[in-house]
Amino acid sequence: MAKLQEVIQHAYDNALGFKRQLDKACISPSDILTVKDLEKIPVLNKDRLPELQSADQPFGSLSAVKPSEMARIFMSPGPIYDPQSTEKDYWRFSEALRAAGFGEGDIVQNTFSYHLSPAGFMFDSALRELGATVIPAGTGNRELQIKVMKDVRVTGYVGTPSFFNLLLDAIEEKGWKAGKEIFVNKVFFTAEMLTEQMRKRCKDNGISVYEGYGTADCGCIAYEDKEGPGLKITDSAIVQICDPQTGSEVSDEEGEVVVTLFDKSYPLIRFGTGDLSRWVKGYEGKRIAGVLGRISDGVKVKGMFVREKQLAQVLNEEGYSVFQAAVTNENGQDQLKILIESEEGLEPGLASKIQDVVRVKPILELTAAGSIKKNDKKLVDNRNYELKRV
């Protein structure tokens, strides 16, 4: 508890945004004596970050150090600015990767983006902390990806399951075999739903599969370790499952994942991720049943959060006020399809303008006037989530 009290006092003294939050709720750092006392602090919802940061750039006065003292600054869709301090393994994913068997002697293909998004560096730093060699492959270009995988004898993969599925397709098209041309024996998936079908495909190829859960803001939150059901909560943060309306903890039902970090440079305390989960029965406070959905208008597509406000902003500026976006998963690949009502057709380059904002390439389709009702949701998730039976 001393560590928690220390970071709360430090945040109150050095992060004006957090001080305002406590003062508004008439709370003093000395009021927080136990983890249970954290409930006194209002949840800071992730969806508020763009507004807070816009009013006080770049971090909404939630950072306890100057931007110039950070190692890197990233921009996630929202936009949301995320800092990285000079601390090694800042996002604390090494414990998850260690549980997945990554370490010295491994050559790991990191297919998360190194451009603006923190995901690439997030796993790069964790892998280096474990002594693994990292190939900063980034996203896209599957032909080059599998060539590197073959030539360098890559042993591990970090990225999304959908992209690895594409790489397996490309490998099969080449006629390459595990143990002969391809030596990947372990994968760590995050940022997307992992289906049992994809898990089986990997295992059929002699590849051990692990998944993890984290966010750009909080880093590692939970991960698979094969020692129990669901995902093990990280040892490096306090994780609560809370009622989205009241912020109170719940023990036997779904709720929002709320995280408190011990990071003194960017002390996110009672941070509401917007993700829904629940405790695994019999493992309350220790294991969660993965991500079961979202409580806000943000939907994760190909590892990126897409928000209704972002889509509306782009489409309204281009003269398309009536639309509906739907997220589906076909053959293991997330797709963002947008139905648009227009009497004049769709402007060339519209898809690119949307992609520039949400970082996901959409499929656009013209639809008849009146087919989208006024009260229809603008952004729907039609994917079939395979809930963990734990």
Segments predicted by a language model, with ranges:
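Short, well-ordered beta-strand segments
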Residues: 107-110, 258, 339
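Active-site phosphate/ATP/adenylate-binding loop shared across adenylate-forming ligases
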Residues: 36, 44-205, 228
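A polyampholytic, Gly/Pro-enriched intrinsically disordered region
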Residues: 154-163, 230-238, 382-390
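AMP-binding/adenylate-forming catalytic core of the ANL superfamily
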Residues: 157, 262-360, 376-377
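Conserved AMP-binding/adenylate-forming
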Residues: 185, 194-283, 297
